Swiss-Prot record:
It comes from the Bacteria. GO terms for molecular function: 4 iron, 4 sulfur cluster binding; iron ion binding; NADH dehydrogenase (ubiquinone) activity; NADH:ubiquinone reductase (non-electrogenic) activity; quinone binding. It is found in: Cell membrane. Belongs to the complex I 20 kDa subunit family. Its EC number is 7.1.1.-. NDH-1 is composed of 14 different subunits. Subunits NuoB, C, D, E, F, and G constitute the peripheral sector of the complex. Pfam families: Oxidored_q6 (PF01058). SUPFAM superfamilies: HydA/Nqo6-like. It catalyses: a quinone + NADH + 5 H(+)(in) = a quinol + NAD(+) + 4 H(+)(out). This is NADH-quinone oxidoreductase subunit B. InterPro entries: NADH_UbQ_OxRdtase-like_20kDa (IPR006137), NADH_UQ_OxRdtase_20Kd_su (IPR006138). It comes from Geobacillus sp. (strain WCH70). It is a peripheral membrane protein. GO terms for cellular component: plasma membrane; respiratory chain complex I.
């Protein structure tokens, strides 16, 4: 970014270029949001055990600025893990609607992304993306905690990219 340095002595312009940070307000908000994600955990099966491992001392999701919340009104990310049944679908939708904007969804595991091994059952939803819009898919049965951290980091990149370019990433 070219800036005209008015009334600044020649030696001080290099010092200013090294120490002054230029950005837009949208990029600053996206940076703050991406570094303070508060996920709502919605564990329905064995993937939830791996999600609990992320909160433990070995992986410690807190060091990335993400703190698990029990209420959808305090969350901005919903992590859905496990088999979603048709009976559970309206509850997931209601929780998603209770979350404040902006909000994002992570589908964790084969069951949440595509129905998993129970996909041919009459009562299983063929992926949580049929209920709520999903931003990040994490494959695996079950995916390990490192994969969930990777997915959260990809969501952070997506938030920053959308603010920088103004384009919605699908």
């Amino acid at each position: 970014m070219d800036v005209k340095w008015l009334d600044v002595p020649e030696g001080d312009t290099e010092e200013l270029k090294r120490n002054v940070f230029f950005t837009t307000l949208e990029q600053l908000k996206a940076w703050a949001r991406s570094n303070s994600l508060w996920p709502l955990t919605f564990g329905l099966a064995c993937c939830a055990i791996e999600m609990m491992g992320v909160g433990g001392a070995h992986y410690d999701l807190d060091r990335f600025g993400s703190f698990f919340r029990a209420s959808p009104r305090q969350s901005d990310v919903m992590i859905v893990s496990g088999t979603v049944t048709k009976k559970m679908a309206p509850i997931i939708r209601r929780l998603y609607d209770q979350m404040p904007e902006p909000k994002w969804v992570i589908a964790m595991g084969s069951c949440a992304t595509a129905g998993g091994p129970y996909v041919k059952s009459y009562s299983v939803v063929k992926g949580v993306d049929q209920i709520v819009p999903v931003d990040v898919y994490i494959p695996g049965c079950p995916p390990n905690p490192a994969a969930l951290i990777y997915g959260i980091n990809k969501l952070k990149e997506k938030i920053r990219y959308e603010a920088k370019t103004g384009k919605k990433v699908l």
